[in-house]
Amino acid sequence: MCGIVGAIAGRDVVPVLIEGLKRLEYRGYDSSGIAVLDGAQVRRVRRTGRVAEMAQAAQAEQLGATLGIGHTRWATHGGVTEANAHPHISAGVALVHNGIIENHEAQREKLRALGYTFESQTDTEVIAHLIHHHLGSAGDLLTALQHTVKELTGAYALAVVSQAEPERFVCARMGCPLLIGVGEGENFVASDVSAIVQATRQVIFLEEGDTAELRRDGVRIFDGNDAPVERPLHLSDVSLASLELGPFRHFMQKEIHEQPRALADTIEAAIDAKGFPASLFGANAEAVLRDIEGVQILACGTSYYAGMTARYWIEAIAGLPCSVEIASEYRYRAAYANPKHLIVTISQSGETLDTMEALKYAKSLGHLHTLSICNVPESAIPRASELVCYTRAGAEIGVASTKAFTTQLAVLFQLTMVLGTLQGRISDAEEAEYLEQLRFLPGSVQHALNLEPQIMAWAERFSPKENALFLGRGLHYPIALEGALKLKEISYIHAEAYPAGELKHGPLALVDAAMPVVVIAPNDRLLEKVKSNMQEVRARGGELFVFADQDSHFSDSEGVHVIRTPRHAGVLSPVIHTIPVQLLAYHTALARGTDVDKPRNLAKSVTVE
């Protein structure tokens, strides 16, 4: 992995490829490259480091062509070297690849026996040689690709050019996202619409097992059986403006500040309906949701913490049992399946491989009803789900998720309301009260954003630290986990989170004067318990940084620093308390001088295991 772009046009496509790769930088990468068909010759430029360095090299070599492919690589097989960077070439065939080929060693040995030699450590070079091998018998590039993919085990998105066929290039998809952009006399392929939005907003999403041929004047798509197939054309709502920084220093900062609008857009349908109709989740949602007897949530990373928060809501308000599992664990265990339990998958991109595979596994076990919560329309997970609700967060570029998380919480709260209503657990008066809380949520988030100057001062104290501890209880324990994740992701400070009640069962051994302890302390029924836990920290010399509600009775004292969030927002308080931990992570990373939007070793869309 991590990003693919390709183009065929009546103009020089090198600027399109370079711009596309720059727009894919947010996904995370460590090297990049392009290959173009210049006359009857494949010319290639690859570099480790930033796309800008590769672009300078391409300019120096005066690369120009009407057909080409490009790639940003995040190392999986083989280290970060120019030899391992894509595109890979076998004779006159050049290829870029996202994904992991699980049987690459067996294929490598077979190819060596046929006389092929390898210049890299990657699984991708195996595919290039296989395509070249099949060209001899297949006679054309598309057929060679179709023969090749049938020999591959694993996940892939591929784009391939051949010097023998200058009028077209081909692509394939299995387990990794890939789309086609349709233009006027030009066509494109990309792993993400942001890579081609400067050229076209008309896109076709390839399905699992699809292969395709792209020419200047048209596109042909074939299914997994190599039969011609039509796929629908969509108009993407991603705009160039959403991919620009504007007045902000980083995309993460921009996206933190976009949360009031993102939340308002996400809850708009419920506000307009003056309630929580099941139709928020699909035309047949009422019939599906009325009969379920429990909920099982599958997700990874930040989305998993959103699911953890929802478990408190679903069990307390809707009165249904709810379990939350890390998708990569669930898919490999002998799980118990209750067909009456709703499977909910959460993924910002809608393409997270572990979550997609967990969904497939749940279906194979006999789960009848599935619902996905995603931010990207027409992505793989929604297409594989019975019901779907899209967060309306807009494009999220920063690797560390912010507005996707809070809008996921907003959707999960609405799901709780729908389930509670259908289960007869919520009265009309209670529904009206919850709706009012939801209505005020964007404004409360804006008030929390106004705490930024105070949090910046805290960040200066955090920046020299090497470790941090986050504590929360009940609904706010998942927010403590999210705060710790954000801090470690972008500042590289080792941070852990625990339920505050677990302090005495181990984590208290870590507390000393050098350990900052962040406490989420809303004015709820567990506040006095949290205060007792805070005393345990102070007694060991730990320094406390407390996020408390306006109506919580806290004050600064020696070793205790307090920032007051807006007045307690009831069951939606976790959304409010997310904002300050995001800001703390952002400004601490800023103070430490890290690359906020592209943290080391991380990718935005995790489309491999």
UniProtKB/Swiss-Prot annotation:
Domain SIS: 285-425, 458-599
Subcellular location: Cytoplasm
Superkingdom of source: Bacteria
Keyword field: Aminotransferase, Cytoplasm, Glutamine amidotransferase, Repeat, Transferase
Active site location: C2, K604
InterPro entries according to UniProt: GATase_2_dom, GFAT, GFAT_N, GlmS/AgaS_SIS, GlmS/FrlB_SIS, Ntn_hydrolases_N, SIS_dom, SIS_dom_sf
GO function terms (MF aspect): carbohydrate derivative binding; glutamine-fructose-6-phosphate transaminase (isomerizing) activity
PANTHER family according to UniProt: GLUCOSAMINE--FRUCTOSE-6-PHOSPHATE AMINOTRANSFERASE, ISOMERIZING, GLUTAMINE--FRUCTOSE-6-PHOSPHATE TRANSAMINASE (ISOMERIZING)
Function statement: Catalyzes the first step in hexosamine metabolism, converting fructose-6P into glucosamine-6P using glutamine as a nitrogen source.
Name this protein carries in UniProt: Glutamine--fructose-6-phosphate aminotransferase [isomerizing]
Biological source species: Xanthomonas axonopodis pv. citri (strain 306)
